[in-house]
Structures are given as structure tokens and as C-alpha cells.
Amino acid sequence: MTDQTTRLPIRRALISVSDKTGILEFARELEALGVEILSTGGTFKLLQDNGVAAVEVADYTGFAEMMDGRVKTLHPKIHGGILGRRGIDDAIMTEHGIKPIDLVAVNLYPFEATINKPGCDLPTAIENIDIGGPTMVRSAAKNHKDVAIVVNASDYAQVLESLKAGGLTYAQRFDLMLKAFEHTAAYDGMIANYMGTVNQAAETLSTEGRSQFPRTFNSQFIKAQEMRYGENPHQSAAFYVEAKPAEVGIATATQLQGKELSYNNVADTDAALECVKSFVKPACVIVKHANPCGVAVSPDAEGGIRQAYELAYATDTESAFGGIIAFNRELDAETAKAIVERQFVEVIIAPSVSEEARAIVAAKANVRLLACGEWSADRAAAWDYKRVNGGLLVQSRDIGMIGSEDLKVVTKRAPTEQEINDLIFAWKVAKYVKSNAIVYAKNRQTIGVGAGQMSRVNSARIAAIKAEHAGLQVVGSVMASDAFFPFRDGLDNAAKAGVTAVIQPGGSMRDAEVIAAADEAGIAMVFTGMRHFRH
């Protein structure tokens, strides 16, 4: 068994990087430690221009770069020096004048940055596929018993610290090896994804008219946390995150206190946070089992998130027990005190948490308190995945939203300004409610939420029952439906409950009947032309 603690000294290093962040300082430190440096192309020039002694690979191999730099390091003196097994291949290395290379610092051509540039064509993309780099990375990673491979600039400092202590341990080299294979796997996956979208039916292969979906789907996530169990205790689980999340979310949040997040905590917190991000004014979202059970926007600037919380909680005090609470403003002491003194809560998440609020929540040591940072108004395009037996459904993320200018009034009566504000509020909430979804709202507070029913009219009935149970009046409220009404009974029920305005996508074969039902009841109705199914 390999000794995990024995340190491997470094006498010779090969440095060839596209991203030169920190490389000059790294090379200087290696030189100060007596390490001989081999280098190539632009990296060699950078070192030479800054007084760092280095040997150009072409001088070492006796073989000049050729084919516009396509062939630089693909040489036995390079790969023999990397792959050579110490104590086994020494004689053959000596016979062929191959010197051992103990450390390889390489990162790859910026393929991702290249293909993301406007106007990038296929030949340009192809020229930015690195060949020599991944080959060296894989060689060094394979022979990690004798060679250290460094692909991340963030590891330079740790490597130098270890070298000053006598060398890198096997445990460190193993970790660097794993990072290297993860790096090349992500790189090759990115290339396969891109090439898999090229229009092969065109007379000339081009990236014009590219498919959104590659022939094989390659995506890499990094394990952030192993969990005690999954959705249920008999299931195992872990939480994986993107290497570069495109926007603030549960994956970027910092846990300030509390028990370890569970599988269900992560899923529910994501639902709550994504919903509250829909609102500009101070808002609160309370979620239970991935469904909003209470949502509110503070009706006045002075009320802040404390008032939003009070209104959201009032929607469904029973379901709020053991729920997830999300805010779109800093959690302040007053709001934190109101929460911990009133209810049992699993998770509280906000862009930031004041020191006073943090001290208050600390009295409830098990409460998971998260700060996620501020987010921009624009939602990032991304992919959503759903596992099915033997396959994976992939779709673009639902970031569609509408404003008042997008509403199509289809009834005789147009909604008032207040009704429009409430309709858009209810529509934003309905987007995050499991289908079939019905939301009653008034003054930008949810009055009743009907979720997950097989029949839309039953969701409407349940939302009304929930409102009555909470002591809230559906009369005078508005109603949002995540999809069209297939029959007029949905509108008839809305009229019976006292709803004054309705927002829905439209598009049913019976739209005319539904509109007639609204007109008969004097209900204002608008179509969005956009559906928000959520399964």
C-alpha cells in the first residue's frame, strides 16, 4: 500500500498554461526552491521576459514546434519524463536521455470562452481544442505516484507550501490527480456538447443553425455535501453544484448556523428562494413540500420584510409550521425575533443577515440560517433536468415572466390598476406552485393556494377552503391559474367565491365559453399567452 505521508521532492517541472493567473509568482518560487523549469510558447516568453530561468521545450527535445504550434509537447522526452515509473523505467529513461519530470502545471486552451464569443465559427472552435495539454495532464495524472499535476491556479499556494516542507505527500498528489481528471472530463464534455450541436446536414459543416441539444449530453457537477439520507430515510443522497453557477441560488448560499441541510431542505429552500427572487419590493415566501403556502409583498416601504412575513404567515399558519422562509432583503432583528418567537422553522434564507438578527436566531441552534448574497434582476438561462427510468429529460429553465404590457384583456371589463398589480403578483406565485395551481390574492398577499390537484377546479375549491380556514376573504380577490381552464366551471367557481379578476394563459378550445362565464359574472380576465406547468 502506498505511504500517504511520504513527501515527493520536486526537481524538474514543466509549465505550460493558457490562463496565466499567478503563474509568474509560482514559477519564481519554484526557481527559488531549485526546481528546473521546462516551458513552452507564450508561457516560456512570459517567464523569460520576467527573469525566470526556464528551458524551452523545443531546446530540450531537439524538436522545434511545428504546424502552427499544434505539435509542441507530443514527444517521448516529454511524455517519457512524465510517465516513467521511478525505480522501474530508470534504465530506459537514461538510455534515451529522458529526464524525470516531477511536476506538471498545465491548463488548457480556452475552448469555452472561444465558443461563447459572438461569431465564433467551426474552424475557430476546432483550433481552440487543446491536444498537447490534455495529453500531458492525463499522463501526469496516471503517474501521480511519481508526478504532481496542477491544473488549478488556486492550488499553487498549497503546492509551494508543501514543497517548502519537503515535498508533496501521496494524499496530496492523489487529490491533484482527481482534479486533473475532472478537469479533462469537463473539457472533453464541453467539446462533445458543442460538436454535437453542429448542423451536419448543411453542405458545409457550420455552427449556424446549431441544435440546442447535443447528441450526447455532458454536464459536470461538484459534490458539495453528502447527506444523511435522501427524500426518504431509506434513500442515500448528496448535493452537487455547478462549478460556475450563473446566478445566486441555494448552490451559492453560505450556511451561518444550524443543523446540516437535508435533501428536502435543499429542494424546498430552492423553491422558496427562486419564488422570492421574482419580486422587487420587500417580499416573503414561506414554502412547505416545495409549494408556496404563503407569499406577500410589503404594501408600504416602511413595512419592510417584517410586514411581508406577517402577511405571508397569515395565509396558512398551519402549513408554515416547519416550513422554509425566504426573503429578498436583509434579515433584520425585528423580523428574526417575530419568526423564532412564533413558529418552528427549518430554514431561513435571505441575501444577508444583520449581526443582531444572527444573534437572535442563534438562540434556536437547530434553525438553518443561510445568506445567499444579492442577485441581479435578470434570470440566467440554464437547463433543468428530470430523471426518468432509463433516461433524462432536459429543458430550458422556465425564466419566462410577463408585465402589465403583456396582458391581453379578453373580457368586457378591463381590470383596474389595483387588480392588475394583484394579478401579476398572483401569476408570479402560481409559477412556483405544483400544477394544477390556483392562487387567490389581494393587496399582493396570497389569500389561498390550491396545489397539485389532478383537476383544476378542485385546486380552486381547495384554495377557497384554505382561505376560509385562515379567516381570509376570497371576496374581492383575484385568481391566477398556471394553465388554461378547460371548462367554464373554473370561472363559475371563481364567481361564486367572489373573485373580481382572473389571470390565465388562455389557449383552450373552450376559451369563448370561459370568457362568457367571466362576462356573465362581471369578472375582468386577462390572458398571458404563457403557461407555467410545474411537476
Swiss-Prot record:
Top-level taxonomic group? Bacteria
What are the protein's UniProt keywords?
A: Hydrolase, Multifunctional enzyme, Purine biosynthesis, Transferase
**What's an example GO BP annotation here?**
'de novo' IMP biosynthetic process
* Cellular component, GO, one term: cytosol
Q: Where is the MGS-like domain?
A: 6-151
One of the entry's Gene Ontology molecular-function terms is:
phosphoribosylaminoimidazolecarboxamide formyltransferase activity
* Pathway assignment: Purine metabolism; IMP biosynthesis via de novo pathway; 5-formamido-1-(5-phospho-D-ribosyl)imidazole-4-carboxamide from 5-amino-1-(5-phospho-D-ribosyl)imidazole-4-carboxamide (10-formyl THF route): step 1/1; Purine metabolism; IMP biosynthesis via de novo pathway; IMP from 5-formamido-1-(5-phospho-D-ribosyl)imidazole-4-carboxamide: step 1/1
Q: Which reaction does it catalyse?
A: (6R)-10-formyltetrahydrofolate + 5-amino-1-(5-phospho-beta-D-ribosyl)imidazole-4-carboxamide = 5-formamido-1-(5-phospho-D-ribosyl)imidazole-4-carboxamide + (6S)-5,6,7,8-tetrahydrofolate; IMP + H2O = 5-formamido-1-(5-phospho-D-ribosyl)imidazole-4-carboxamide
The name under which this protein is listed is Bifunctional purine biosynthesis protein PurH
User: What is this organism's lineage?
Assistant: Bacteria, Pseudomonadati, Pseudomonadota, Gammaproteobacteria, Pseudomonadales
